[in-house]
């Protein structure tokens, strides 16, 4: 399985197509993760649509202060606090586990575009 992290910026999305072609040529499962997505930014929907048009599942992780606080403490977000940030990471892991055929312990991503 290949997880392709990218930010929802024009520069990152321009390179994304090459990464997706490599994953598809390898004939393996793939997941595009739009990372550090600003809240309520209209460009996110556009970035999601473009990423989805490339043929892989798309997930999004928001740009949230709890991630920075957890990093500064040397902790994972699940160790740091409960809330949208930890829910997004748990849902992301669930999607990865599902694609790998591992029984996930949490719900799948709600905001996935296939």
Where are these regions (language model features)?
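Inter-motif core of Ras-like GTPase G domains
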Residues: 1-9
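Hydrophobic anchor at the start of a short beta-strand
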Residues: 2, 29-31, 57-58
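Conserved C-terminal guanine-recognition region of P-loop GTPase G domains, centered on the G4
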Residues: 13-39, 47-51
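Beta-strand-loop-alpha "switch" segments that mediate conformational coupling across diverse proteins
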Residues: 38, 48-76, 95
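C-terminal boundary of histidine-terminating zinc-finger modules
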Residues: 71-91
């Amino acid at each position: 399985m290949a997880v392709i992290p990218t930010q929802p910026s024009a520069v990152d999305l321009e390179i994304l197509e090459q990464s997706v072609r490599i994953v598809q040529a390898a004939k393996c499962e793939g997941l595009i993760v739009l990372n550090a997505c600003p809240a309520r930014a209209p460009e996110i929907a556009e970035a999601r649509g473009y990423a989805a048009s490339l043929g892989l599942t798309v997930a999004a992780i928001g740009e949230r202060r709890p991630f920075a606080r957890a990093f500064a403490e040397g902790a994972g977000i699940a160790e740091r606090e409960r809330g949208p940030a930890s829910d997004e990471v748990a849902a992301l892991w669930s999607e990865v586990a599902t694609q790998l055929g591992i029984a996930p312990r949490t719900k799948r991503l709600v905001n996935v575009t296939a």
